[in-house]
Amino acid sequence: MQTLHALLRDIPAPDAEAMARAQQHIDGLLKPPGSLGRLEALAVQLAGMPGLNGTPQVGEKAMLVMCADHGVWDEGVAVSPKIVTAIQAANMTRGTTGVCVLAAQAGAKVHVIDVGIDAEPIPGVVDMRVARGCGNIAVGPAMSRSQAEALLLEVSRYTCDLAQRGVTLFGVGELGMANTTPAAAMVSVFTGSDAKEVVGIGANLPPSRIDNKVDVVRRAIAINQPNPRDGIDVLSKVGGFDLVGMTGVMLGAARCGLPVLLDGFLSYSAALAACQIAPAVRPYLIPSHFSAEKGARIALAHLSMEPYLHMAMRLGEGSGAALAMPIVEAACAMFHNMGELAASNIVLPEGNANAT
């Protein structure tokens, strides 16, 4: 059975030759070179992923939603009752939440995964529960390092198993009351930003309570002293089980050479952790939408990512990742279905990158 160290060691590099061939093919399609903008770059990125066998393609699609509760909820950083995590997880099994509707529209299966819900087990939910909620990061670590490592490995294996069954495009999502607080703490640590710059309203926290949330994030960092150069240390000290789970999806998909669509702010924090743990993960990550949460711009700048969609969304759950799946499929359709200039009797001047 593969260890976490072995999994990280075996993440493949992108296939540069396949990417060069893809770029050459795209430049010869029935359009001025570069005129489809970032769709062309996305197709080239996909072509370089070894799990796609040298060509942009989408087989089965899966949304992995990590559900967990957080001890820091006790600090008054969220307006929703903690039980909402369990209620919404149950609603996900019925297909009635935002991510479920959008994933169904995109033709993706939603995997609802309990990595730490503070409630009795929920029928229809995948059980990877570590504990009934993580620790309160304002007074101590979220979890032990061994718990974080074990969950990373379990989720990575689950992701790779899905790849073996035909999934070639993953999306990540989360569900957990108060989870924007640990996400903000992680972004603060990884980017070196003050909590004031990255703490937002989450699920409609009143403005009068923002200062408390900022103070909680600062206390969490001061008490736990996470090492920004050690992604697992940051996850275990100021993260949460859902954030660890999303990180595990990214590690597992990268190990299989397959793409992962990020969602919003919560997933940005997990992506920062994943890239710190294994920089080789970065080429497999695809940003979906620009989260309306305050710290989004800072996190994305640190990841050097520009999302494809600007929808003023901050629901979470993986909703933005599901919404962006058709964009990935559009890049593949462009690559495979457009005609070629050579067969059309059209000759374009060299360097013409503008549509006529």
Swiss-Prot record:
HAMAP family: CobT (MF_00230). This is Nicotinate-nucleotide--dimethylbenzimidazole phosphoribosyltransferase. Catalyzes the synthesis of alpha-ribazole-5'-phosphate from nicotinate mononucleotide (NAMN) and 5,6-dimethylbenzimidazole (DMB). It holds the Pfam family DBI_PRT. It comes from Salmonella schwarzengrund (strain CVM19633). It is an enzyme of class 2 (transferase). Pathway: Nucleoside biosynthesis; alpha-ribazole biosynthesis; alpha-ribazole from 5,6-dimethylbenzimidazole: step 1/2. The active site is at residue 317. GO terms for molecular function: nicotinate-nucleotide-dimethylbenzimidazole phosphoribosyltransferase activity. Its EC number is 2.4.2.21. It comes from the Bacteria. Gene3D superfamilies: 1.10.1610.10, 3.40.50.10210. Keywords: Cobalamin biosynthesis, Glycosyltransferase, Transferase. PANTHER family: NICOTINATE-NUCLEOTIDE--DIMETHYLBENZIMIDAZOLE PHOSPHORIBOSYLTRANSFERASE. Homodimer. Disulfide bonds: none annotated. It catalyses: 5,6-dimethylbenzimidazole + nicotinate beta-D-ribonucleotide = alpha-ribazole 5'-phosphate + nicotinate + H(+). The keyword Transferase applies. InterPro entries: Nict_dMeBzImd_PRibTrfase, Nict_dMeBzImd_PRibTrfase_bact, Nict_dMeBzImd_PRibTrfase_N, Nict_dMeBzImd_PRibTrfase_sf.
